[in-house]
Amino acid sequence: MNFAKFQQLVEHRTGFRTMENPTASGEYFSDSCGDLYTFFLKVGPGDVIEDVTYFTTGCGFGTATCSLLVELAKGKTIDQALAITDADIEAALDGYPEKKKDYPERSRFALQAAVEDYRAKRAAGQITDAMLEEARATVAAAAAAADRRGNGTTEEDAKAGPKVLEDAGMLTIKLH
């Protein structure tokens, strides 16, 4: 196991946040330890996962594993994300301790639930390609407007939502 990478994942918690207006979401509850894993997806045209975030009540291994899955799934199509295996997640961390080998499966089940939610909404006509294009255009327009105002907000910032920044003891909340 790569402990340095594990520590980095726990400290940075890539993607650890809820998402406002996700295209889809899904959760998995682990009966073995009581952890809840929830994944949120923003899916764009071509079924590309433009953003993926998560929330978990789990420990450091749960957080690290979900962060790894965010890194592996972001920018992939729905089908490519579904093809991510427990072995792929485990390999990204150079293995897991024997007692923690079920963590990749837990996070993957939550991501699969989000994909199933997305597919169900597509099948029911609740999500169309036109809607995905419109959502992408709205985010791009918000980022462009912020750039014109000169506040340095990028399209990625607009997708991410509010940020709390701390500098020299001053706390700033950036709402975009």
Where are these regions (language model features)?
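C-terminal binding/interaction regions
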Residues: 1-19, 25-26, 79, 86-176
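Structured beta-strand/loop patches that form or line metal/cofactor-binding pockets in enzymes
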Residues: 13-46
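Active-site- and interface-proximal helix/loop "cap" or "latch" segments in soluble metabolic
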Residues: 31-32, 44, 48-105
